[in-house]
Amino acid sequence: YALEYDRLAVMDKWLLSKMNSMVKTVDSNLDNYMIPEAARALQEFVDDMSNWYVRRSRDRFWAKGMEQDKINAYMTLYTALVTVAKAAAPMIPFMTEQIYQNLVRKIDPAALESVHLCDFPEVNESWIDAKLESDMDEVLKTVVMGRAARNTANIKNRQPIAQMYVKADHELSRFYVEIIEDELNVKQVTFTDDRSEEHTSELQSLAYLVCRL
């Protein structure tokens, strides 16, 4: 199987964009001997990959058969994991070597014998989409605030909510709104800059959620 960028889902393109941005940051930090900053960039990417991409892609990973969408999800994750191993190799040599042997050498015995013989990952600028990264960051912020609002109101996530207002001076596309609605178990998310008494009373009487970006 091969990674075919033009056939990837938005979540796949987001992860690859974040991956290339991470490689760019880590490479720059290592060149300037900024080791803690390089490690932090790697950690943040792994957190995003584990806590967001993998969780949002579970249905694709476990889908029956080997449809193209499932292959795309697997290949995107595989590419990200191998890239992380290569980028982190100077800092955590033994762990990344084990990852490389399990992910690469077991599949391709003709591959280089060690991760430490591999070149540092090259940045693919064409895969970096700043707008996509920014929009997904807004989704993540909204989800975090929505969960906090639920906790404050003592409303568990399994209990559906009719409406959530997001205080913001802009709106996200329907694709991202649907992700928020799914993550927070909300029937309708509305972006608004209106903080009128009408919305306040609705919040108090119907236990609506209000978040602010």
What are these regions (language model features)?
Residues 1-197, 201, 205:
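Feature 926 captures the class I aminoacyl-tRNA synthetase adenylation module centered on the KMSKS loop
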Residues 203-204, 209-213:
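Hydrophobic alpha-helical segments, chiefly the membrane-spanning helices
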